[in-house]
Amino acid sequence: MNESFDKDFSNHTPMMQQYLKLKAQHPEILLFYRMGDFYELFYDDAKRASQLLDISLTKRGASAGEPIPMAGIPHHAVENYLAKLVNQGESVAICEQIGDPATSKGPVERKVVRIVTPGTISDEALLQERQDNLLAAIWQDGKGYGYATLDISSGRFRLSEPADRETMAAELQRTNPAELLYAEDFAEMALIEGRRGLRRRPLWEFEIDTARQQLNLQFGTRDLVGFGVENASRGLCAAGCLLQYVKDTQRTSLPHIRSITMERQQDSIIMDAATRRNLEITQNLAGGVENTLAAVLDCTVTPMGSRMLKRWLHMPVRNTDILRERQQTIGALQDTVSELQPVLRQVGDLERILARLALRTARPRDLARMRHAFQQLPELHAQLETVDSAPVQALRKKMGDFAELRDLLERAIIDAPPVLVRDGGVIAPGYHEELDEWRALADGATDYLDCLEIRERERTGLDTLKVGYNAVHGYYIQISRGQSHLAPINYVRRQTLKNAERYIIPELKEYEDKVLTSKGKALALEKQLYDELFDLLLPHLADLQQSANALAELDVLVNLAERAWTLNYTCPTFTDKPGIRITEGRHPVVEQVLNEPFIANPLNLSPQRRMLIITGPNMGGKSTYMRQTALIALLAYIGSYVPAQNVEIGPIDRIFTRVGAADDLASGRSTFMVEMTETANILHNATENSLVLMDEIGRGTSTYDGLSLAWACAENLANKIKALTLFATHYFELTQLPEKMEGVANVHLDALEHGDTIAFMHSVQDGAASKSYGLAVAALAGVPKEVIKRARQKLRELESISPNAAATQVDGTQMSLLAAPEEASPAVEALENLDPDSLTPRQALEWIYRLKSLV
């Protein structure tokens, strides 16, 4: 049967009718249909689930005359299966039994209680703890894009309005949403194709009036002026759709989503998608996390601190007041790192616990962890109180104390609660008198049964008699088969076993009813008290979220203080003067993976020295030198200390990199096309305050096409845009640029060649390189000796053709580098055919005269 169901379900059994009606409401996602201790899937859902989860596909009888494909998973293992599905971009509707089987006529009443989607998960089992999990929505009109993101596990709600396609692509790269909502008429599908968790939504969900109404209702406001987003119509369209989707899937109130923030380009350093990829900030070029900037810098001790640090790295701020405050805090905290980090480690992931509290899905162990976090606050306050720093004291104030809530949770929750409240044993003894009474009644069963067993043995004289309990038959008196014929007349047989008989007596049955009632009453009351705890905690949610944010920021700053001390970083100085001056700068990642000391290098960029033409051998360190400059600037603009002896840095609005390239086969773009697209983006968007890294421009095409493009790009950047530029090249003709224009200088990375070997010095020197050492590098790479020999031969031949051809033809027509050598003269031909060993002295003399006549 296909899932495009006919609306007439009358041919099906009542249970399948109920299932099909629920499934018709959620046709595009999997439906987990609760039946007893299992969640069942039927028809096409069962087939898909069996493939996605590698579970058995079976059949369940027949309905409407056809066998029903079925697959099932145990309810206690549902989180593991949900995690697998979410990681594959699937969404699941969870359908629970809400009716009482004992009183239901026909199928037990069921309804979908929540929808689990990749972008709306909050359960810790489904989340990557050190990575944000974002739901996003994108909207487009003739003026640009609207983009909104929400981290439901923290309540962080952001919107932006990228003006063009490149900026929008950069935002998608930066935020990397787990789920992306888009309008059904979205025109730029190429922009989002291939992304995980794509969800097509109807146009009406993006209506601006509906969006304003939804957002005002959520925040309890009359307008959005206070959030600074009133006029961001494109962003609001996206935000409205996103909020509607969250409400549809969560089916509960969202008190932790209390505000929305506008992210403006002018507030942060802009990095496009290529730059984020090339700088390997949180992901390396192979898609992993090893040997990235975050891998070196992130030694935070809480998951929420780790997530905040990654947000900082992907969004460096331009406000130097904020940056200087962070620098001051890092300096002030350096002496207390070893005391603070062990305490902070105990705080855990308070941010996500609070989100689950707001959604009323927090489990007993979440509340125990919250209590443990509160218990660390007095120690943190005591340690920070002595730190002489206004920013530190401001953070300490935001952390709060929450002594009353700590006391409440200490009284209410036992030390090591079970996973689920339905298992009982969550509320601590002494917290509620009535609960203690019901528990005492239930727990007193053991003493009563021991007394009953002793009494009945003495009364009957049956030494094999014992009293027991099982979940199926309840309490019983058991007598061995050999003595069962001696059972008293008031013993009513309940169960026959191979070697024994089990009985019940009125007294035991009466006690059983009493105990089971007390257990049920205790569990029901415990669940009620647990829910009341939420009601007591939620009024403090805003203060708790502020505290969690302050603790995460403290973790980040303490971590940066530790990294600065451990890795020998220094505090950079911000200046209003354009430029970057670095003394003994180092690459933060490369220096950690090298087995030998890293060679530190200087850099000086200023209005009088805007562009460096960087030459030198392959493997000499040109790309490392360029990237380390960008990473030092990036670290400075998150407020961190930097890997250098001294850094003075002026205003930077954007960082661009044109470093390396590969075919983009999915989009049908060659390596050269990718290179030129990235170059065009730089030339259109760079400003005099931009930091631009250009590596080997033009190498993807013919020599003189490439040289001409590289020359023109360098001219444009130096003369028109006047950006701060590092321009690495193997075109030695470009080393003439400093002679032709102001603000351009040559530097090179040194190497020493000895015979057929080469030693890279990795040190930056003024002036142009003398040669490229390409053949020496090829020999190091293991290219066969005969190939290297032939290459040297061809190199000499090419150099003899026109050693200065390139310099004289930069603006001229392209000359063939592999032109055929000139015809040999008759004298040369005669010599080639001559065998000197076969000549007599007289013949040799004659040949000399003959050759002279041929010259």
Curated annotation (Swiss-Prot):
Annotated residues for binding of ATP: 616-623
InterPro entries according to UniProt: DNA_mismatch_repair_MutS, DNA_mismatch_repair_MutS-lik_N, DNA_mismatch_repair_MutS/MSH, DNA_mismatch_repair_MutS_C, DNA_mismatch_repair_MutS_clamp, DNA_mismatch_repair_MutS_core, DNA_mismatch_repair_MutS_N, DNA_mismatch_repair_MutS_sf
Keyword DNA-binding: yes
A Pfam family: MutS_I
Record SUPFAM superfamilies: DNA repair protein MutS, domain I (SSF55271), DNA repair protein MutS, domain II (SSF53150), DNA repair protein MutS, domain III (SSF48334), P-loop containing nucleoside triphosphate hydrolases (SSF52540)
PROSITE patterns recorded: DNA_MISMATCH_REPAIR_2 (PS00486)
Molecular-function annotations in GO: ATP binding; ATP-dependent DNA damage sensor activity; damaged DNA binding; mismatched DNA binding
Domain of life of the source: Bacteria
Protein family according to the UniProt entry: Belongs to the DNA mismatch repair MutS family.
UniProt xrefs under HAMAP family: MutS
Function noted in UniProt: This protein is involved in the repair of mismatches in DNA. It is possible that it carries out the mismatch recognition step. This protein has a weak ATPase activity.
Classification via NCBIfam families: mutS1 (TIGR01070), PRK05399.1 (NF003810)
Alphabetized PANTHER family for the sequence: DNA MISMATCH REPAIR PROTEIN MSH1, MITOCHONDRIAL (PTHR11361:SF34), DNA MISMATCH REPAIR PROTEIN MUTS FAMILY MEMBER (PTHR11361)
Protein name according to UniProt: DNA mismatch repair protein MutS
Annotated gene: mutS
